[in-house]
Amino acid sequence: MPELPEVEIIRRGIEPWVVGHIIQRAEIRNNQLRWPIDQEIISIHQRRVISLKRRAKYLLMQLHHGWIIIHFGMSGRLRILAHMLPPEKHDHIDLIMSNNCILRYTDPRRFGAWLWSNNLDKMSILNNLGVEPLSDQFDGHWLFTKSRNKSLLIKQFLMTNKLVVGIGNIYANEALFAAGILPSRASCSLKEQEALLLARSIKAILLSSIEEGGTTLRDFLQSDGRDGLFAKKLQVYGRHGEPCYTCGEFIQIAKYGQRSSFFCPSCQN
C-alpha cells in the first residue's frame, strides 16, 4: 500500500504536468473501484487544475468548482503518458490534459478511490485524520504528551490515523528500529528522551524514503514508471531470519494488531 512517502512522490511527479493545465475530459473504463466514481468526475469537461496537495495518503486535486480526492488503496498508481497508449487490463481512468499528456490511473486490486467534493471541510474521511508526521506540529513533545494516556502498543499508536497519519507498517518498523524501541512497548511507557528520538527517526525515515523515490516491494512505481529505491535501505522490514546490519543478531517477526512487526531483539528494547 502506498504510504505518505509514495503519495508525496506521486504528487511531486505529476504536479508540473497537471497544475495550471486543463482537464479536457475523463475516460473511465471501470467505474467500480472501492466506491463508484462520482458523476462529477465522469462528466468532467474543460476544467483547470488549480493545485495538487496531499493530506495523509490522499491526493487532493483542486479545480475551480471542487476537488478530486484520490486514494490509492493497496495497489493504485498514477503515471504521466506523453501520448496515448492502448490501455491495459488494470488501467481504469485517464484524464486527458490540454498539454497533450494523459494522467493514467492503474489499480489491479481496485481498492483505490476517486471521490468528488465541493467542500473539503465536509468530507468525513478527511475530518478525522491526525497530525502530519512531517509537520512542525509533530515532534517529540507532541508524541510524548499524546502517548501518556494510551494503552496502545507503540507500533499501533504510530499506525493509528486519528493520531498521526501516513506512517504505515514499513516505516513504523524502520523508525522504531532507528530509535531502538521494541514495537511491543506500551506507548505510555516511552520516556521523554525516547519520544524525542522516535519523532526525529520518523521524520528522517520518511524524508529519506521520499529522497529515494519511495519503497517498491510489489506494485508501487513512481509517476515516470521507475521503482522506488528505499527498499535497498530497509534495516528490518521483510528481513525475518536475516542478520541485523548493526549487531549481527537475527531479525525477528511478531504480529501485533494483525500486522507483522520486524525487529532486532538486541538493538531494540
Swiss-Prot record:
Keyword DNA-binding applies: yes
Any GO molecular function? class I DNA-(apurinic or apyrimidinic site) endonuclease activity
Instruction: Indicate the residues that form the catalytic site.
Output: P2, E3, K57, R259
**Keywords assigned by UniProt?**
DNA damage, DNA repair, DNA-binding, Glycosidase, Hydrolase, Lyase, Metal-binding, Multifunctional enzyme, Zinc, Zinc-finger
Amino acids binding DNA: H90, R109, K150
A biological process term (GO) from this entry: base-excision repair
| Domain of life of the source | Bacteria
PROSITE patterns, alphabetically? Answer: FPG_CAT (PS51068), ZF_FPG_1 (PS01242), ZF_FPG_2 (PS51066)
In residue numbers, where are the FPG-type zinc fingers?
235-269
Pfam families from the entry? Fapy_DNA_glyco, H2TH
Coiled-coil stretches = none
Q: What is its EC number?
A: 3.2.2.23, 4.2.99.18
Q: Which cofactor does it need?
A: Zn(2+)
Give the co-factor note. Answer: Binds 1 zinc ion per subunit.
* Subunit-structure text: Monomer.
Please explain the role this protein plays, according to its UniProt record: Involved in base excision repair of DNA damaged by oxidation or by mutagenic agents. Acts as a DNA glycosylase that recognizes and removes damaged bases. Has a preference for oxidized purines, such as 7,8-dihydro-8-oxoguanine (8-oxoG). Has AP (apurinic/apyrimidinic) lyase activity and introduces nicks in the DNA strand. Cleaves the DNA backbone by beta-delta elimination to generate a single-strand break at the site of the removed base with both 3'- and 5'-phosphates.
Q: Which PANTHER family match?
A: FORMAMIDOPYRIMIDINE-DNA GLYCOSYLASE
**Which family is this protein grouped under?**
Belongs to the FPG family.
Q: Which HAMAP family does this UniProt record tie to the protein?
A: Fapy_DNA_glycosyl
Please state what the protein is called: Formamidopyrimidine-DNA glycosylase
Its gene is mutM
